[in-house]
UniProtKB/Swiss-Prot annotation:
GO MF term set: 4-hydroxy-tetrahydrodipicolinate reductase; NAD binding; NADP binding; oxidoreductase activity, acting on CH or CH2 groups, NAD or NADP as acceptor
Cysteine disulfide links: none
GO cellular component term of the entry, any: cytosol
Keywords: Amino-acid biosynthesis, Cytoplasm, Diaminopimelate biosynthesis, Lysine biosynthesis, NAD, NADP, Oxidoreductase
Presence of keyword Metal-binding: no
Annotated protein name in UniProt: 4-hydroxy-tetrahydrodipicolinate reductase
Function: Catalyzes the conversion of 4-hydroxy-tetrahydrodipicolinate (HTPA) to tetrahydrodipicolinate.
Cited HAMAP family: DapB (MF_00102)
Originating gene: dapB
Binding annotation for (S)-2,3,4,5-tetrahydrodipicolinate: H160, G169, T170
Organism this protein belongs to: Pectobacterium atrosepticum (strain SCRI 1043 / ATCC BAA-672) (Erwinia carotovora subsp. atroseptica)
Amino acid sequence: MKDLSIRIAVVGAGGRMGRQLIQAIEQMDGVVLGAALERSGSSLLGSDAGELAGLGKNGITVNESLDAVQNDFDILIDFTRPEGTLAHLAFCRLHRKGMIIGTTGFDDAGKAAIKQAAQDIGIVFAANFSVGVNVMLKLLEKAAKVMGDYTDIEIIEAHHRHKVDAPSGTALAMGEVIADALGRDLKSCAVYTREGHTGERDPKSIGFATVRAGDIVGEHTAMFADIGERVEITHKASSRMTFANGAVRAAIWISSKESGIFDMRDVLSLDDL
């Protein structure tokens, strides 16, 4: 029998990621779906969340109001958009609910609001919840320390046509890890577009290239290129379930934290390696 002690609310339950999260919760021990939410006016309101996810009826009705399900969940998982996530964050902070944030595209003010809320609740805020991506970030840190000062560094990412922010949060996280390892400020050394006569490449720059096409789930490559050789570290996701499973794993982990902001490196204890 499933341990019902950790009840999870999924925001955006009818979306691609929301349905995968509901499936992941159903498959993982120690958690149960406590609430499923959709935006006001959605045609999915009133639907059974289990049926939406292709699992059959589970008795959880898709709701539009966090107030209505306040007592039905302990941890909220949010992979929506910045403005919605910040509204959900305020609710969770007020009612002392832990939060898993997979939303990307926050500006500096949004990131500051998340850090401030973490004074009162436990938050896992990560650009990518895939175990493989987070192992890749650790590898990038090590590669940058060995090769970064004498190679040209480029980050290439590809996603489906529906993704609305670029570069991806994961690509930016890759850049941050590399820049930090080299003692550089990513805001100062990042190059996001190249067009026309650009001049010679700045050897201290970190370049970004973006592809948006078809149904690509997510592909990320960091290239360390020297004269005569280059090293490429790549992660390719073939299913959103890898992100969903990681997010549910993070929800279990954060349930024991009263406050603080963490990422998947904390959840996976990667800094201990």
